[in-house]
């Protein structure tokens, strides 16, 4: 019944298996990818005919993670997979980028590639399998897919490169890099790095490139046995058509490209296609040429003009040399109500960035095949239509916006402080207000400025730069800080972000074959010099984080309590913690280890919540001094309430150094007095003294001492030995330790 064909290879100690002919047999191409316990189904469907009047290649890639692959039922009301998650969007783009340039340039038939994770093994990088499976399925389909692509993931642990590291290993890795390419050249790189040098990054790319060559071999073997006849393709346009357009319109195109302003240049260039189509209207009606052929020939002429100026004259359309960076302007603190803000402008590209602090309750919850986890740092990239003067409605975040945001996130994440150093969740929003190339790198620069102004103690400022490439034969030019047109007509988009010490993120997309490691080395070094120049300009405005947070930022403090006290703070059904939040206006988050984080809009609210938590969870120690309230006066003494919910007794002899006739002559109900805990009676009730309590210089009112000496009698040391044991088990962090962050002093 099935004519199944299978090819396999042992790759990094595990068997990688590609098979076809059993599942999804009606699709134009279908490959099942297996490695470990991971199983993916990758399918391709190609439309029989191209749509009339289409002027681009309509390739759609959809990567899906089925919940059942990890033995889970989807969350939510409908209990089924729905809108693509950010992770699925990012992997879809990861598949698309190395594959899209490898189709015949004249191919415009609608093509759909679907990669579904059917079984999930956390030891196997399924995004890598998806790229491999998509490439294999395309090689079997009728689509004119010209090269086979494979991919690998590279980590760096203890100075050694690791192929396809597990999720657990990636937690300790200095590098998370994905590289994809053909048997001859690298096509795509995506990475996050912890301040690695250009040499280390290049070696990592080489390592990954060499590692996936055996995979390309089995894709080719599978295609040789199972591929379908490829669609026959003609040239994108007749050579005679291009020559005729050049003869008639080349001077007008050159004049338009000589305009340095993007807005004016685009306006003039946009007038030319209509003139060209009008000239060839009879040929279009007679079906000698199609609109797409004419527009493609015109684009080729525009490309030739731009590329020749660069290669022959070392001159770009805005007048810069290949290494020049556009003029930079930086401004900080322009949004008074935001916790941090910055405006970064580079030429005609501009990003307005804001930083907002939240609590641990504001962290992004992510539900993935690995399980649920939280992201403390969020970065949202927004690309509104007005940034390129387009009259379009604002829509939900596009795939491009998700991808650019993640790239900027990768660039910033390695230099952020950990949660102990900075207890807030952080959201950065970067809105591209103008765009003419490299808006994602403007986002990186603006984010670094906004974070420093907000007072986030980042390790070092970060800047990003986009590099381009123009290559004809052996002649090439690497371009620094590319424009939109240079990206469109060029051969490479190479984005590098990092500090003055090293790289934090790298993304490379190559549109042609034959880009070797020599060119990549030149591009990396040129990017380093450009990055240092940009950092120098940024540092003139702000070079290190502000010492204080914005007055609009929430206040926070933490207190460590005994884990047994957690239930007391929460209360039945959360009653107690809800009441504390309502009374104080603060937000409270309790970790399983007994760390209580309190967040409030001001310090007064913070103190109210802190005092109430301490009253419940903190056990007083002998020798500590508190503010107390006289609750009841007796002939023999008085009952005092302290720490909110604790009561003790002051004997008449402990009220004053001098002899007093009656307690009521000194104390009245409602009086506020300072009291010192001097011990406990045989029933465990607190014994207090007022004598000299207000003169004790060690008094800190409500802040308990963690190292107070225990001078009480044995029967008075109520559970003190138990407390000491608990403290030792918790690295001497006692239940009474309060940490108030320096950012609020």
Curated annotation (Swiss-Prot):
Its EC number is 2.7.7.8. The keyword Ion transport does not apply. It comes from Rickettsia massiliae (strain Mtu5). Its cofactor is Mg(2+). One of its GO terms (molecular function) is 3'-5'-RNA exonuclease activity. Residues 623-691 form the S1 motif domain. Involved in mRNA degradation. Catalyzes the phosphorolysis of single-stranded polyribonucleotides processively in the 3'- to 5'-direction. The keyword Metal-binding applies. It catalyses: RNA(n+1) + phosphate = RNA(n) + a ribonucleoside 5'-diphosphate. Coiled coil: none annotated. CDD domains: KH-I_PNPase, RNase_PH_PNPase_1, RNase_PH_PNPase_2. It comes from the Bacteria. Gene3D superfamilies: GHMP Kinase, N-terminal domain, K Homology domain, type 1, Nucleic acid-binding proteins. This is Polyribonucleotide nucleotidyltransferase. The gene is pnp. Residues 707-719 have a biased composition (Basic and acidic residues).
């Amino acid at each position: 019944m099935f004519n199944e064909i299978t090819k396999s290879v042992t790759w990094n100690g595990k068997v990688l298996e590609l098979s076809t002919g059993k599942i999804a047999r009606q699709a134009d191409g279908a490959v099942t990818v297996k490695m470990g316990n991971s199983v993916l189904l990758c399918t391709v469907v190609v439309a029989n005919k191209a749509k009339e009047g289409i002027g681009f290649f309509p390739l759609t890639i959809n990567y899906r993670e089925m919940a059942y692959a990890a033995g889970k039922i989807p969350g939510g009301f409908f209990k089924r997979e729905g809108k693509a998650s950010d992770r699925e969007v990012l992997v879809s783009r990861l598949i698309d980028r190395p594959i899209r340039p490898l189709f015949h340039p004249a191919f415009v038939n609608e093509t759909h590639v679907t990669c579904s994770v059917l079984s999930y093994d956390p030891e196997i990088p399924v995004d890598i399998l998806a790229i491999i499976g998509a490439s294999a399925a395309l090689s079997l389909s009728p689509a004119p897919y010209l090269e086979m692509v494979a991919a690998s993931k590279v980590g760096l642990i203890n100075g050694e490169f690791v192929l396809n590291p597990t999720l657990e290993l990636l937690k300790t890795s200095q590098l998370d890099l994905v590289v994809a390419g053909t048997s001859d050249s690298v096509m795509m790189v995506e990475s996050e790095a912890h301040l690695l040098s250009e040499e280390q990054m290049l070696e990592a790319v080489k390592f990954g490139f060499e590692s996936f060559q055996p995979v390309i071999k089995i894709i080719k073997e599978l295609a040789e046995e199972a591929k379908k006849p490829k669609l026959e393709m003609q040239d994108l346009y007749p050579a005679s058509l291009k020559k005729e357009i050049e003869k008639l319109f080349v001077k007008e195109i050159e004049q338009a490209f000589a305009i340095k302003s993007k807005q004016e240049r685009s306006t003039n260039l946009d007038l030319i296609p209509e003139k060209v189509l009008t000239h060839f209207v009879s040929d279009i009606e007679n079906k000698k040429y199609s609109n797409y052929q004419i527009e493609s020939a015109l684009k080729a002429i525009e490309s030739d003009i731009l590329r020749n100026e660069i290669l022959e004259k070392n001159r770009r359309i805005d007048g810069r040399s290949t290494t020049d960076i556009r003029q930079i302007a930086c401004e900080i603190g322009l949004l008074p109500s935001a916790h941090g803000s910055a405006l970064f402008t580079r030429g005609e590209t501009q990003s307005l960035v804001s930083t907002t602090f939240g609590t641990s309750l504001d962290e992004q919850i992510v539900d993935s095949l690995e399980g649920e986890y939280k992201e403390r740092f969020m970065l949202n990239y927004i690309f509104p239509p007005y940034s390129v003067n387009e009259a379009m409605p604002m829509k939900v975040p596009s795939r491009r916006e998700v991808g650019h945001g993640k790239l900027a996130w990768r660039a910033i994440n390695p230099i952020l402080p950990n949660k102990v150093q900075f207890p807030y969740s952080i959201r950065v929003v970067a809105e591209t207000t103008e765009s003419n190339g490299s808006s994602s790198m403007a986002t990186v620069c603006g984010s670094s400025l906004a974070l420093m102004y907000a007072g986030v103690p980042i390790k070092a400022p970060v800047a990003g730069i986009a590099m381009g490439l123009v290559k004809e034969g052996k002649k090439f030019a690497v371009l620094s800080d590319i424009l939109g047109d240079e990206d469109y007509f060029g051969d490479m988009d190479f984005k590098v972000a990092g500090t003055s010490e090293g790289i934090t993120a790298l993304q490379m997309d190559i549109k042609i074959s034959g880009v070797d490691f020599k060119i990549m080395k030149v591009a990396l070094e040129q990017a380093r010099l450009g990055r240092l120049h940009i950092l120098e300009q940024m540092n003139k405005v702000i070079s290190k984080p502000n010492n204080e947070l914005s007055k609009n930022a929430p206040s926070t403090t933490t207190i460590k309590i005994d884990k047994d006290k957690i239930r007391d703070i929460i209360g039945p059904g959360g009653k107690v913690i809800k009441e504390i939040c309502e009374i104080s206006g603060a937000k409270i988050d309790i970790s399983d280890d007994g760390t209580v984080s309190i967040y409030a809009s001001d310090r007064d609210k913070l103190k109210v919540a802190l005092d109430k938590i301490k009253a419940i969870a903190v056990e007083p120690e002998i020798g500590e001094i508190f503010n107390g309230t006289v609750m009841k006066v007796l002939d023999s003494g008085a009952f005092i309430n302290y720490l909110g919910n604790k009561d003790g007794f002051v004997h008449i002899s402990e009220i004053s150094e001098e002899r007093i006739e009656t307690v009521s002559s000194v104390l009245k109900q409602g009086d506020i007095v300072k009291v010192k805990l001097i011990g406990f009676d045989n029933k465990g009730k607190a014994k207090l003294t007022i004598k000299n309590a207000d003169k004790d210089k060690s008094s800190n009112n409500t802040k308990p001492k963690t190292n107070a000496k225990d001078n009480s009698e044995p029967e008075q040391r109520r559970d003190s030995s138990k407390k000491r044991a608990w403290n030792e088990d918790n690295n001497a962090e006692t239940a009474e330790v309060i940490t108030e962050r320096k950012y609020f002093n």
